[in-house]
Amino acid sequence: MSINVFWFLPTHGDGHYLGSSEGARAVDYSYLQQIAQAADRLGFGGVLIPTGRSCEDSWLVAASLIPVTQRLKFLVALRPGIISPTLAARQAATLDRLSNGRALFNLVTGGDPEELAAEGLHLNHTERYEASAEFTHVWRKVLEGETVDFAGKHIQVKGAKLLFPPVQHPRPPLYFGGSSAAAQDLAAEQVELYLTWGETPEQVKEKVEEVRAKAAAKGRTVRFGIRLHVIVRETTEEAWRAANRLIANLDDKTIADAQQAFARFDSVGQQRMAALHGGKKDNLEISPNLWAGVGLVRGGAGTALVGDGPTVAQRIQEYADLGIDTFVFSGYPHLEEAYRVSELLFPHLDLATTELPTQRPATQPQGEVVANIYVPQKVSQS
C-alpha cells in the first residue's frame, strides 16, 4: 500500500534542543517559506500547520505560502465554537480555490480549558464535542453546495449557503483526531481521515478497530493517519544519540512545569501521551524504536520513531499494516530534518503520488454577484 507522508511547519518555534533557547532559531516568514519549499521539492504530500495561542495563525500562513509552492497541500485547523461554520466554509472554499485544490482541513476541538476560555469558549469536554458535531454537519453541507437550515443545541443557522464552490469535489477532505469515545463517534460519523498521535502499535490498533467498527455501523468507511516525530540517521546508534541530544538541556523543573500545565487539560489524547513517559527521562523507548522524549515538554504529538532508514521504514510498515495510510512527520530543526527524512527514509517507502484536481474558476464569467445573493446566469443565445 502506498502511503502519504506530510511534514510540519513549526510556527510555534524551532531549534536543536527541546525546552531550551540554546540552538533556537527565529521562525519568521522566510524560514517557514524555506521549509515549505523544501517539503514541496522533496516529495512530501503536504504540511500540517499547528493551531493555538502559541502559534501563528494557520490560515494566514497557508495562504501566504500558496504562491511559493506548487504541489504541497496545507492541512489547516477548523476551530468549532470559535468561528461560525458558515464563515469557516466560505474561508475553506476560498483557500481551496486560491490553492487550486491544495487545501485540507483539520477539525480541532481543543483540550486546554484555560486557552479555550481566553478564546471565549466556555464549554466542557462533552459540550465541546456536541458543538463540534453540529459545526461539522453545517460546514460539510454548506461546502457541498446545500442551503442549510439547522437548529441545534449550540449551532443555529438559517439559509446558510456558498456562492462559489471549492475546487475539490464535493469538498476538501476533513481530518480529525481525538481519543475519547465522543471523539471517535464524531470521526466515525463525519470525517474522512481519523488521526491519532504516535502511541504504540498495540494502542493504535485498538483505536483503529474501534473507529472502523463505529464507522461501519453508520455505513461509512474512514481512513487513518498518525502524527509522529522522526529522528532518522545513517545508523541507528547515531539516531539514538541525536534523540538523547534533543533533550540534553532539559532539567527536572522544566519537565515538571510542563507536565503540570498539561495536567489541566481535559484532552484524553494528552492524558494518554503523558502516561507513556510519566514525566521521567528514563525508559523513554516505549516500544521498539518508539521514543517518548518529545512529550516531556511538548504538548500534543510527543513520540518519535528513531533509527536508520530501513529500521524506521519497518516501524512505519507496522503501522501501515494496521490501516494507517497517512503519516504526518516532523523533526528538529524542521528544515534540516526534512532533508534527512527525504534522503534517508523516502528510498525505503512506497510513497503515494500527489494528484491535483482540475481547477474551477474562482468567480463566474457572467459578472458580479447581484445584491450579494445571486450569481448571474449565462444567457443562452438563440
UniProtKB/Swiss-Prot annotation:
CDD domains: Alkanesulfonate_monoxygenase. Gene3D superfamilies: Luciferase-like domain (3.20.20.30). GO terms for biological process: alkanesulfonate catabolic process. Keywords: Flavoprotein, FMN, Monooxygenase, Oxidoreductase. GO terms for molecular function: alkanesulfonate monooxygenase activity. It catalyses: an alkanesulfonate + FMNH2 + O2 = an aldehyde + FMN + sulfite + H2O + 2 H(+). Its EC number is 1.14.14.5. The keyword Repeat does not apply. Catalyzes the desulfonation of aliphatic sulfonates. Belongs to the SsuD family. PANTHER family: ALKANESULFONATE MONOOXYGENASE, ALKANESULFONATE MONOOXYGENASE-RELATED. FMNH(2) which is absolutely required for this enzymatic reaction, is provided by SsuE. This is Alkanesulfonate monooxygenase. It comes from Yersinia pseudotuberculosis serotype O:1b (strain IP 31758).
